[in-house]
């Protein structure tokens, strides 16, 4: 296998591991998976002449700014929301109510992705199909998802993200 996909038990988050040239597997971050899918969607829509002039991408405020550089390159608006897919869903509804933008993709660094408007929450099934399609497409060009991620970094710059979890138990945690 060139890639391994896995979801959480309720299938709303997706993790991806990609085989490196030395045969080992590299786990992609939620931000990297999101940017790979974003780049694939925008590239394909542009190549097909189907990239809407009012296209919009939505991400949470804690997700990578690399998405902003990708969106800018494709002339697509990027909107930040508070953390939580309910806010991405609300933004989609706002777009539909006003007709201001056409939703293209939404994601959070916590491995949640949304590429359609018929679901308003993160969707691991749809995301699995999308990243598998991207992996197949790039394999026809002799590239892996790691190769494409390297191309994205080279084109838009390298972005370092670091997630840290701090636990402050009980009453001592309040101090």
What is each stretch, according to the model?
Residues 13, 33-36, 85-89:
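Short gly/pro/ser/thr-enriched loop/turn and capping motifs at secondary-structure boundaries
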Residues 29-41:
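Catalytic or ion-translocation cores adjacent to nucleophile or general acid/base/metal-coordination motifs
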Residues 1-3, 24-26, 44, 48-175:
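Phosphate-binding and adjacent anionic-ligand microenvironments
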Residues 1-16:
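N-terminal small/polar loop signature for handling phosphorylated ligands or for N-terminal nucleophile
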Residues 12-31, 67:
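Short Gly/Thr/Asp-enriched flexible loops that form oxyanion-binding sites at enzyme active sites
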């Amino acid at each position: 296998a060139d890639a391994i996909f896995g979801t959480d038990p309720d299938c709303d988050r997706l993790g991806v591991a990609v085989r490196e040239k030395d045969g080992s597997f590299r786990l992609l971050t939620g931000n990297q998976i999101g940017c790979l899918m974003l780049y694939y969607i925008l590239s394909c829509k542009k190549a097909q002449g189907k990239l809407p002039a009012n296209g919009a991408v939505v991400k949470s405020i804690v997700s990578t700014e690399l998405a902003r550089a990708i969106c800018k390159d494709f002339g697509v608006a990027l909107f930040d929301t508070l953390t939580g897919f309910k806010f991405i869903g609300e933004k989609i509804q706002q777009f539909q109510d006003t007709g201001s933008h056409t939703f293209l993709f939404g994601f959070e660094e916590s491995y949640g992705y949304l590429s359609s408007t018929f679901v308003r929450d993160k969707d691991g099934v749809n995301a699995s199909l999308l990243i598998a399609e991207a992996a197949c497409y790039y394999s026809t060009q002799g590239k892996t998802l790691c190769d494409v991620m390297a191309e994205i970094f080279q084109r838009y710059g390298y972005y370092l993200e670091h997630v840290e979890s701090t636990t402050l138990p009980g009453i001592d945690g309040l101090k």
